[in-house]
């Protein structure tokens, strides 16, 4: 560890984080910098991320807000971080995910490595041969209404790295930059589109339910013995 730095963050992890972001592709954020442009000065850009994150001086820029249509009607806001910020988020994800992943319910499929919506569908189809009813529900505005304080409290239970908590707080508070250029502060919720979205939105407690105030839904999601299948906001309980 560099003795002049406050936090121990590996430069190798920062480089790996960029490779993950590059593989995922994605659009430019508020600075209009593409992955190709970022990569053209890769050494300096990765050093900048490492230097700021390891010294506690990294502050995320505004998140580019894009409205996308919902299947049920209306729109939802997709948050597009800058490439640099996506790399910083991926650094945090690479440190945090190994600690959280073993604690997740085996029937939780949303945003987990090696699992997909297709896997959730396969589990549901298999159980249709054993159970004669299915309850499907959608948690309305799940990501838009997550309580920041409760979320940070829950994440703090699963890591002893203070820099992870520090930066998650800053990401939660990063404002939206709307299409017309105006900046909108956020006091709750977490943008859909960020790299650490799943780690910020789900905890291993209570069947990985997001920090919900609706206790009956939390209870329903904990009925793992009756064939619970979770995929993002959309969930199914079979019996």
Where are the predicted features?
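Conserved polymerase palm-domain catalytic core
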Residues: 52-67, 71, 103-107, 111-239
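Short helix-capping/linker segments at secondary-structure and domain boundaries
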Residues: 96-103
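Intein modules and their embedded homing endonuclease domains
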Residues: 40-41, 48-51
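Conserved phosphate-binding loops in nucleotide/dinucleotide-binding enzymes
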Residues: 77-78, 82
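Nucleotide/phosphate-binding loop and acidic/charged catalytic motifs
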Residues: 92
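Duplex nucleic acid-engaging cores and interfaces of nucleic-acid transaction enzymes
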Residues: 84, 88
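Non-catalytic, polymerase-adjacent accessory regions of viral genome-replication enzymes
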Residues: 1-43
């Amino acid at each position: 560890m560099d003795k002049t730095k406050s936090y121990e963050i590996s430069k190798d992890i920062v480089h790996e984080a960029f490779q993950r972001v590059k593989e995922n592709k994605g659009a430019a954020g508020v600075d209009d910098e593409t992955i190709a442009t970022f990569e053209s000065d890769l050494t300096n850009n990765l050093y900048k991320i490492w230097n700021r994150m390891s010294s506690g001086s990294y502050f995320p820029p505004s998140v580019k807000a894009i409205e996308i249509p919902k299947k049920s009607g209306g729109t939802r806001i997709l948050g597009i971080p800058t490439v640099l910020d996506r790399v910083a988020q991926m650094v945090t994800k690479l440190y945090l995910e190994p600690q959280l992943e073993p604690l997740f319910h085996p029937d939780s499929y949303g945003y987990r490595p090696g699992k997909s919506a297709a896997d959730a569908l396969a589990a549901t189809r298999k159980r249709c041969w054993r159970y004669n009813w299915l309850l499907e529900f959608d948690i309305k505005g799940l990501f838009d209404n997550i309580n920041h304080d409760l979320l940070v409290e829950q994440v703090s239970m699963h890591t002893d790295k203070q820099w992870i908590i520090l930066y998650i707080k800053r990401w939660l508070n990063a404002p939206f930059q709307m299409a017309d250029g105006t900046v909108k502060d956020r006091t709750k919720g977490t943008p859909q589109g960020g790299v650490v979205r799943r780690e910020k939105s789900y905890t291993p407690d209570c069947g990985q339910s997001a920090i919900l105030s609706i206790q009956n839904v939390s209870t329903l999601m904990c009925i793992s013995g009756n064939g619970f299948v979770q995929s993002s906001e959309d969930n199914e309980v079979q019996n």
